[in-house]
A protein has these predicted regions:
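C-terminal peripheral helix-coil segments that are non-catalytic and often amphipathic
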Residues: 3-19, 34-77
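Membrane-interface starts of transmembrane alpha-helices
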Residues: 28-32
Length: 77
């Protein structure tokens, strides 16, 4: 199951590289692993993120969105 998710993410990244959305010097597997890691880390630690970031219950997803946007802005054209 995890392999299917990783394969899907890698294919999305490959398409994004092909259409010029992501820098062409990126390795699709590395980008996919990084995105997956950010998402998994969030779900493993969301209670602590809420406490440390002083987010109200249910608004800690803002952290995930900002973390993903920060990473994606560093690899996109």
């Amino acid at each position: 199951r995890l392999y299917k998710i990783h394969k899907f993410m890698s294919e999305l990244v490959t398409e994004a590289i092909a259409d010029g959305s992501i820098h062409n010097n990126m390795q699709p597997t590395h980008v996919a692993f990084t995105l997956e890691s950010i998402i998994v880390f969030f779900f493993l630690t969301h209670d602590q993120i809420r406490d440390l970031g002083h987010f109200e219950n249910g608004t800690e997803s803002t952290y995930l969105e900002e973390a993903l946007n920060t990473y994606l802005s560093s690899i996109t054209n």
